[in-house]
Every structure is written in C-alpha cells, then in structure tokens.
C-alpha cells in the first residue's frame, strides 16, 4: 500500500505545483486507478471504497510522510550492515546515535553512526540488499 500512497501523494503535489486544482472525485478516481494498477488484473476492487483511501489514511496528512518509511528502512539497513560487516567502531557509533535521542536532528544523529542520508549511498545499499533477497527467492522457486 505504501508505494501506491507515495505515487498518489507525489501526483497530487505535482498537480498543485502546475496550478491544477484538486477535487474529491478526481482524487477518488486516481487513487482507485493506482490501486487497480498495483493489484493487477487478477484482483477486482471496489473502486469507490478503495478510491476514498486518500481521505481516510492519516499518513497523507503530513507532506511526504509515506516517503519516510523508505528513508527509515534505508538508514536502518545502513546501520545494521555496518555492524554486521564488523566495521570497526560501528557498534559504538550506533550507541552514540541512540544516546543522542532527540538532542540532534535525525540526519545529524545518523551521521554520528556513520550514515549520511544526504547521499544516495544508504538508499542504493538498501536496494542492493533487496536485489540480493530477490535473487535468493528466485533461486529457491527455480
């Protein structure tokens, strides 16, 4: 559901940036289209019920909140990979990150642990892990 919500949110912001209006019927239709596309032709959906998701899903009340899942997963992957790889000082840096609590902005706290979310590296590394898992799954199912 999150990729569908992210696409919807981006499209609605782009419409506003182009000076186009938003109306409930348009938003319902677009949300239903995105869910239908995501589920594929094998599954039928109740378009009015699924289409109104945008109005009932609180994640969409904060700008680009849904995208924070992807960045959070990427950061967590980067933190764990440093520790699992035995990177010297990684565990201690992770403890410093945790100890910072809310005393630092999240991006600054992550830098304490050796993760720079201002670069593409953490997201690229997360995709590499995902690609490896897909490869393993494909090998299992033949």
Language model features with spans:
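C-terminal, non-catalytic "cap/extension" segments appended to globular domains
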Residues: 2, 6-142
């Amino acid at each position: 559901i999150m990729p569908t919500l992210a696409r919807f949110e981006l499209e609605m912001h782009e419409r506003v940036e182009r000076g186009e209006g938003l109306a409930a019927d348009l938003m319902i239709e677009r949300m239903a289209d995105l869910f239908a596309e995501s589920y594929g032709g094998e599954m039928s959906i109740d378009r009015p019920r699924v289409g109104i998701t945008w109005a009932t899903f609180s994640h969409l009340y904060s700008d680009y909140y849904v995208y924070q899942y992807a960045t959070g997963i990427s950061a967590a992957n980067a933190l764990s990979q440093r520790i699992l790889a035995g990177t010297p000082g990684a565990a201690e840096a992770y403890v410093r990150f945790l100890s910072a609590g809310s005393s630092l902005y999240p991006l600054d706290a992550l830098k304490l642990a050796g993760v720079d979310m201002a670069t593409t590296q953490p997201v690229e590394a997360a995709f590499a892990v995902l690609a490896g898992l897909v490869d393993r799954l494909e090998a299992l199912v033949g």
